[in-house]
Design a protein with these regions (language model features):
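FAD-site-proximal beta/loop scaffold in flavoenzymes
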Residues: 253-287, 372-449
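FAD-binding core/adjacent interface of flavoenzyme oxidoreductases
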Residues: 68, 92-94, 101-152, 213-288, ...
């Protein structure tokens, strides 16, 4: 078959259409329509099949992107899905939530002049279509080794570890405190980015592969780590980072101030019918003037959730300029379309409260961009005399996350760093092995809060380390 080498000129990049704005703003459903078969084939055909594919190297799991784009263009969906799963445990999830503009698509040779290949949406199409057509991972040639591994945490790192172990004949048993798998994929990422049926289907697939899940089971409460270490040949910790970071602001504990993650988790549990808990109470922003402090993707999740809860007005306040905002440009664009007001170069100084002690606004100061910090990002420097109050009824703090307390881990000789992260070097003889040789760890609890795909990559590498340790 002759190839049109100028296909990227003849056919421009096309993204999937979004649902109508009036529907998006009131529903917790994914806003992007899926590609049709014709759209997926045509967009996949734009790939140049570069000899040195930068997209593949920029991807943390090093997906065989040009290869499965070619298969998608040829309509060979089962083969594309099989190839996709060779490197990625959750390709249909990454196709939805990865910041492709900063990873594969941002590195596409066509990106600057012609528009990158729509890699993420084709990845989603390939795997959704394959599942719809009945494709499932084939483990018929896998021989059981008799080894068993306990995995604590059913988030992306834990699921990735379980996937690789299972494909190599090791029995994986996954423990998680939530009533569904996915961790923050399910309970932290709102349904307008990742519908929850995606993870329900994924649990069915994993169960069919032989992975066992023990949900609503919290280590330290329902099961003890000491018992797991006796019962299993190794233990993997993929517990994430759940402790919200605060800004040290005046009155930040006042009624009406909320941490981002409990707010998002409780909202999702409400939608899924799981109810609320004392540490994650459901909060409705209906009729309220909401201010979300922070500029990352979690902040975008909070402002867009508030819109769908029918907030009266929603502001995202960030201390740097838009260029230095860490959140996905795509998510910022979506939030703007949905009516969110962005205030850049404003530094929160404190929460204002009324006579009843409830939130009535946030005291801000304007900032200007200074010299770069240690990470290369320009510092936000307060402009003297620029203090002002922005009225509001609710404040959500989205300043990031750090490791939560793990008292159940303290007696098991696992070293932590100064920030409370587990020390588990990738470059050790057994990748991601901790100071307790029987315990491995990966994902956010090792590297700090990061992307879904980096957690998947580390979970898979940790599984390789475990296989090496078990000599299987």
């Amino acid at each position: 078959m002759s190839q049109n080498v100028y296909q990227f000129i003849d056919l421009q990049r096309v993204d999937p259409p979004k649902k109508p704005l009036k529907i998006r703003k009131i529903e917790f459903v994914e806003i992007y329509e899926p590609f049709s078969e014709g759209q997926a084939k045509a967009q996949a055909d734009r790939c140049l099949s570069c000899g040195n594919p930068y997209c593949e190297w920029k991807c943390p799991v090093h997906n065989y992107i040009p290869n499965w784009l070619k298969l998608a263009n040829e309509g060979r969906i089962f083969e594309a899905a099989e190839l996709s799963h060779q490197t990625n445990t959750l390709p249909e999830v990454c196709g939805r939530v990865c910041p492709q503009d900063r990873l594969c698509e941002g590195s596409c040779t066509l990106n600057d002049e012609f528009g990158a290949v729509t890699i993420g949406n084709i990845e989603r199409y390939i795997n959704d279509k394959a599942f719809e057509m009945g494709w499932r991972p084939d483990l018929s040639d896998v021989k059981p080794t008799g080894k068993t591994v306990a995995i604590i945490g059913a988030g992306p790192a834990g699921l990735a570890c379980a996937d690789v172990l299972t494909r190599n004949g090791v029995k994986a048993v996954v423990f998680d405190r939530h009533p569904e798998i996915g961790g923050l994929l399910t309970f932290g990422i709102p349904a307008f980015k990742l519908e929850k049926e995606v993870m329900t289907r994924r649990r069915e697939i994993f169960t069919g592969m032989g992975i066992e899940f023990k949900l609503n089971t919290e280590v330290g409460r329902d099961v003890q780590l000491a018992d797991l270490l006796k019962e299993y040949d190794a233990v993997f910790l993929g517990v994430g980072t759940y402790q919200s970071m605060r800004g040290g602001l005046d009155n930040e504990d006042a009624p009406g101030v909320y941490d981002a993650l409990p707010f998002l988790i409780a909202n999702t549990k409400q939608i899924m019918g799981f109810g609320e808990t004392a540490d994650e109470p459901y909060v409705s922003m209906e009729g309220k003037r909401v201010q979300v402090l922070g500029g990352g993707d979690t902040a975008m999740d909070c402002v867009r959730t508030s819109v769908r809860q029918n907030a009266a007005h929603v502001i995202c306040a960030y201390r740097r300029d838009e260029e230095n905002m860490p959140g996905s440009k795509r998510e910022v664009k979506n939030a703007r379309e949905e009516g969110v007001e962005f205030q850049f170069n404003v530094q929160p100084l404190g929460v204002e409260v009324n006579a009843n002690g409830k939130v009535c606004g946030v005291k801000m100061a304007r900032t200007e961009m200074g010299q770069p910090d240690a990470k290369g990002r320009r510092r936000a420097e307060i402009v003297p005399g620029s203090e002002h109050v922005v009225p509001g009824d609710a404040v959500v703090m989205a300043f990031g996350f750090r490791p939560h307390s793990m008292e159940w881990l303290a007696k098991h000789s696992v070293e932590l760093d100064s920030q409370g992260r587990i020390i588990a070097p990738e470059g050790s003889e057994n990748a991601f092995q901790t100071s307790n040789p029987k315990i491995f760890a990966g994902g956010d609890i090792v590297r700090g809060s990061d992307l879904v795909v980096t957690a998947i990559a580390e979970g898979r590498k940790a599984a390789d380390g475990i296989l090496n340790y078990l000599e299987v």
